[in-house]
Amino acid sequence: MLPGLALLLLAAWTARALEVPTDGNAGLLAEPQIAMFCGRLNMHMNVQNGKWDSDPSGTKTCIDTKEGILQYCQEVYPELQITNVVEANQPVTIQNWCKRGRKQCKTHPHFVIPYRCLVGEFVSDALLVPDKCKFLHQERMDVCETHLHWHTVAKETCSEKSTNLHDYGMLLPCGIDKFRGVEFVCCPLAEESDNVDSADAEEDDSDVWWGGADTDYADGSEDKVVEVAEEEEVAEVEEEEADDDEDDEDGDEVEEEAEEPYEEATERTTSIATTTTTTTESVEEVVREVCSEQAETGPCRAMISRWYFDVTEGKCAPFFYGGCGGNRNNFDTEEYCMAVCGSAMSQSLLKTTQEPLARDPVKLPTTAASTPDAVDKYLETPGDENEHAHFQKAKERLEAKHRERMSQVMREWEEAERQAKNLPKADKKAVIQHFQEKVESLEQEAANERQQLVETHMARVEAMLNDRRRLALENYITALQAVPPRPRHVFNMLKKYVRAEQKDRQHTLKHFEHVRMVDPKKAAQIRSQVMTHLRVIYERMNQSLSLLYNVPAVAEEIQDEVDELLQKEQNYSDDVLANMISEPRISYGNDALMPSLTETKTTVELLPVNGEFSLDDLQPWHSFGADSVPANTENEVEPVDARPAADRGLTTRPGSGLTNIKTEEISEVKMDAEFRHDSGYEVHHQKLVFFAEDVGSNKGAIIGLMVGGVVIATVIVITLVMLKKKQYTSIHHGVVEVDAAVTPEERHLSKMQQNGYENPTYKFFEQMQN
């Protein structure tokens, strides 16, 4: 019986995995899906062979909006009629992720949750209902929520019936990845636990798996991109630096031995974190010790949703795991966390965890314990290497607190309306107005707290980027000052410094793009500041690269590598700017009325006009060769003006030599007052090019429009007057002109006829004829 049931379940699962909508898609082997992992090119399912393929354009990476995900599905599957997207129920392991600008793809897998690209008219999933399981469904026509919300509703409904959620699917789409209901299958706890135990027994011989991170997580995370652009910057920056350290090819053997590969270190940390119990310890003591530990994110920066047992609350709570390190109080699901830790803790905690939670099934549960000082705690804590994780937790606590307060107000509102049924109409309106004002006040307060949280996070990220850039610049200068200087070491330090500057520029552009999407007016206000900051970055890079010419022997040896490095960075910059400035943005609602950056008259050009980016462009005042720089055995030469001829009038801080160079002198760029107050400026050779609107031409256009308007108004008035006169002259009111040559009797007869006189003779003959 059991083998037959297993074969039946396997066949049904295989049929569902290969199931695709039948809207003209006969012959497809797999369902259209896309997967994203920040820092790597997007992947999509090849519907012809059932394998994952990399992004065909070689430029698209993680997308942070559902509209963008839908558009990307339509781009990679142009022959299919993609109408919607929905997050998959289960994560998958995908290998061979490619990085933008790199030819070779890494072989180690990443664990992500893909998005299903729905084809044609929406059709609900066919769920398999095993024996002793129940099929349930919930619909709310007044609710339009995400996949995560309905998954939570299904899980809580099964928990209330003392069952486990076996499978689920969405019902009644109402937007992009939003639905009005869910269908799900609940199975008894005993059978689910048997299935879990059998699966664990096949995969691992140990009695208890403590939820530690596998090596597959060392460099990856689940692909849930739900935050705005600035919330992901720290994770992306640190992951990029880790990958850059892997790809660096140091020429010095000592450095290669000293520097440890990133993934080997994370694998060793993971293996230490997942060490099982020794034979001398009892299982209960170890479980109690593990479940009493605090949640740890770890040194990595992935954002994997996990659960840990909170001793103070007596239940499992969610947190974000970095992907490596941490401790063993780390579980995939809330059910598994409670199964391991709930039975091993004290009886009081056990009773607390076994009490059913009376929650509204259509309300999102609180994802983190809310405290009154949730934001204050984050603001008072100084920033550190775990800034992104701290920001995520603070944001979750803030949202949880806001949801709790809104729920409390709504309950009070319902109770007040129930009590005010018999009150006069004026009193009912007063009650409604009172609670409306209260809700608006809570919304405004939450918005202010969110803004304060984001601004603090942005400031800390900028400070972190500045510290890294300063450290990279100091290492670069130290490498140049070494006696004798090692060219390979100098190049590696220069490469890290250039990347640090590029990270700063990327962060600035990403922040500006986010502000432009959220608040176009504020983006227009900060545009000049962004442009000035980008120009300062290029000035600083020019001055730093000019130091390389003070050591001509090193400059000659690493010429090709530096050209290749700068060309690669320039190509990446072209892609970033093309995506952020030129790429059209699909939006829904009022956001679609926002003007595109490319439609404005202000032109932003952050790159050279000719598209080339090499050391010669950054150093037009020098050419490679030993003859171009006078020899100096002590490496003390006069500093070179690292700017084009048009900018050499700008004052800079003088320096006495390479040995006296300070980081602050290079990072500080002074601008002439006339340059700063000018309405527009233009800088070539990797400088910012900014064309402001011509104020004079605008005034002339306005005057011309005013004169034209006056002329048109005058013509209209004259035309109306003439028409009115013509209308008056055409009215006769029955007056008949009389010839002056007629006799007085005839004139008198005409007047009598005008006054109604009728000749009796004529009247007599008319009556006779009638």
From Swiss-Prot:
Chain positions recorded as heparin binding sites: 96-110
Glycosylation sites noted in the Swiss-Prot or TrEMBL record: N542, N571, T633, T651, T652, S656, T659, T663, S667, Y681
Compartmental location: Cell membrane; Membrane; Perikaryon; Cell projection, Growth cone
UniProt PTM comment: Proteolytically processed under normal cellular conditions. Cleavage either by alpha-secretase, beta-secretase or theta-secretase leads to generation and extracellular release of soluble APP peptides, S-APP-alpha and S-APP-beta, and the retention of corresponding membrane-anchored C-terminal fragments, C80, C83 and C99. Subsequent processing of C80 and C83 by gamma-secretase yields P3 peptides. This is the major secretory pathway and is non-amyloidogenic.
Subunit structure: Binds, via its C-terminus, to the PID domain of several cytoplasmic proteins, including APBB family members, the APBA family, MAPK8IP1, SHC1 and, NUMB and DAB1. Binding to DAB1 inhibits its serine phosphorylation. Interacts (via NPXY motif) with DAB2 (via PID domain); the interaction is impaired by tyrosine phosphorylation of the NPXY motif. Also interacts with GPCR-like protein BPP, APPBP1, IB1, KNS2 (via its TPR domains), APPBP2 (via BaSS) and DDB1. In vitro, it binds MAPT via the MT-binding domains. Associates with microtubules in the presence of ATP and in a kinesin-dependent manner.
Binding site for Zn(2+) 2: H677, Y681, H684, H685
Effect of mutating H147A: Loss of a copper binding site
Designated name of the protein: Amyloid-beta precursor protein
Reported induction: Increased levels during neuronal differentiation.
Effect of H147N: Binds copper. Forms dimer
Outcome of substituting D739A: No cleavage by caspases during apoptosis
Consequence the record notes for mutating H151N: Binds copper. Forms dimer
Gene name of this polypeptide: APP
SUPFAM superfamilies: A heparin-binding domain, Amyloid beta a4 protein copper binding domain (domain 2), BPTI-like, CAPPD, an extracellular domain of amyloid beta A4 protein
Keywords, in A-Z order: Alzheimer disease, Amyloid, Amyloidosis, Apoptosis, Cell adhesion, Cell membrane, Cell projection, Coated pit, Copper, Cytoplasm, Cytoplasmic vesicle, Disease variant, Disulfide bond, Endocytosis, Endoplasmic reticulum, Endosome, Glycoprotein, Golgi apparatus, Heparin-binding, Iron, Isopeptide bond, Membrane, Metal-binding, Neurodegeneration, Notch signaling pathway, Nucleus, Oxidation, Phosphoprotein, Protease inhibitor, Proteoglycan, Secreted, Serine protease inhibitor, Signal, Sulfation, Transmembrane, Transmembrane helix, Ubl conjugation, Zinc
